[in-house]
Amino acid sequence: INIGFIGAGAVGCSIGKYLCENSSIAKIKGYYSRTSKSVDIAATFTNSKAYASPEELVNECDVICITTPDDIILKVWEQIKNYNLQQKIICHFSGSLSSDIFSGIEETKAEKISIHPMYAFSDKFTSYRQLNTARLTMEGSSKAVKVMQELFGDELHHKIFMLKASDKVKYHAAAAFASNYVVGIFDVALGLLKDCGFTDEDAVSLLGPLTMGNVKSVIENGTLEALTGPVIRNDTGTV
């Protein structure tokens, strides 16, 4: 399967590098982006081609992965849907958008799919190393799902969950609550300790074990059993 990426950020680089190192089915053809520097970096990182135009990439690939910010996915689609897409798979990796964003794809004779790894792509050059641990969600046309299940499920052994297109926003909200919102709450807690005179380092060392212990307990025992402190003791005055 010849795969190309439109968008050369952390997600595109990580998935491309991961497939390069772990798949015998996928061949990474290369990258296109509006920023030539990021294209060159991604192509070098994955030993692939830096494309000068999206049309050239589309012509040479079976699967076109749009790994841009969410707000740009539709703009990319509006551009590439005018190319010859017959029998190609158009894919994006947004957590909140469904494959329905590829409006009119039936007329192009292409297939559509959205794939979302439940994974934090924190670094363009190292995140791929633990990507094998990620669970994936998919939704799209049956033909596209079959091809990508064979790649990520059958060959790479990822646990895959199927979603309804109508559930993507709710699904993404769940991911946000469990990831970025946790970071935000932790930052509030750090701020409160710093107001008490703690240094950044001491505040992290104090709260870190508590946070890690709670997360571990939630995963192992469920949310109700993980509750501790004044809430579980019914200390209403403290609460």
Cite the ranges covered by each PLM segment:
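Interdomain hinge/lid region at the active-site interface
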Residues: 214-239
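Rossmann-like NAD(P)(H) cofactor-binding subdomain of soluble oxidoreductases
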Residues: 46-126
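Nucleotide donor/acceptor-binding cores
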Residues: 1, 88, 134
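Short, well-ordered alpha-helical microsegments
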Residues: 39, 73-74, 98-102, 145-146, ...
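Short, hydrophobic beta-strand segments that form beta-sheet elements in well-ordered domains
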Residues: 28-33, 90-93, 136-139
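Internal alpha-helical scaffold of NAD(P)-dependent oxidoreductase catalytic cores
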Residues: 38-45, 107-109, 126-219
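NAD(P)+-binding Rossmann beta1-loop-alpha1 motif at the extreme N-terminus of oxidoreductases
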Residues: 1-56
